[in-house]
Amino acid sequence: MKDEGGDAVSAINTLVGTSFNINTRKPKIYNVFGGLSGPAIKPIALAKVLEIKRKVDIPIIGIGGIMNWKDIIEFMIVGASAIQIGTLNFIDPTAPAKMISDLENYCIENNIQKISELTGSFILPN
């Protein structure tokens, strides 16, 4: 990817989903298909970031279901250099700013000098 000019990659965004009313048999979503996002996609997003990290050597922006500072740490451990928050901003636009102090406290408690030390620090089972 880097050889082709890619400076970074983001993963993932909303997944396509649908839902139907069992009584009317009509879609609950006017356009039939809609976006599935938020905490429901976090495990998929984490797996994709880890998969990408194992294949490329460029920064990865982790996206998908980040609702608290622990989610940020988890995305960084699997390889994200940065994160993007979507759904949470609709719930509480001030939440991302509040997470910074929690991240700082985590780093202090775990003797982490720079948060970037977390990026790709996963330990896989033998």
Predicted regions and their residues:
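Alpha/beta enzyme core
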Residues: 1-61, 67-85
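Short Gly/Pro-enriched loop/turn and capping motifs at secondary-structure junctions
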Residues: 66-68, 90-91
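Residue-level recognition of conserved structural "scaffold" positions that shape functional pockets
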Residues: 71-72, 93, 118
